């Protein structure tokens, strides 16, 4: 068994996911290769929310994979796979858990196998609708993380879909200008 720990350039020194996780505190902190400010509170919350193995979460637009890598490092019973348009962007998700699609509108065909989806700072609300319409039949819930100011552009994509039961957890270690929304199927 080989464990490959990706490295990141942070503050002039090389750091792996273990070293980065030790820098986390309850207060959100910015990292150069993640749009979302990250805190130990947020990682703990997401690890408790996301499904446990053998189920997995698909992070659509995972970027460097820092958030996803920190979640898996925190709780190894959680599996998070990434989807991105370019595999070279990824630095923290294990290669076998990284999936590449052709372009910003590309859908990963096995997305319906995931128990949950996570969108972190997504660029286009229409991509969420496209995923829901194409692969949303078997997904249990969707987590949206991004700027509060952007939520109004995304809210209709959820409220007009099967995932219209929305919750807005607070006190989970985000900055005041960021939010998380958990979208579940309406009952």
List the predicted regions and their residue ranges.
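Residue-level preference for short coil/turn positions at secondary-structure junctions
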Residues: 52-53, 76, 112-114, 138, ...
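C-terminal substrate-binding/active-site "lid" region of AdoMet-derived donor-dependent transferases
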Residues: 124-186
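Structural motif
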Residues: 56-58, 116, 141
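Short amphipathic alpha-helix with an adjacent loop that forms part of the alpha/beta core around
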Residues: 48, 101-113, 132-133
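A short SAM/SAH-binding and catalytic strip from SAM-dependent methyltransferases
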Residues: 114-127
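SAM cofactor-binding core of SAM-dependent methyltransferases
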Residues: 56-108
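Short, solvent-exposed loop/turn segments at secondary-structure junctions
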Residues: 63-65, 87-88, 123-125, 148-150
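S-adenosyl-L-methionine
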Residues: 1-52
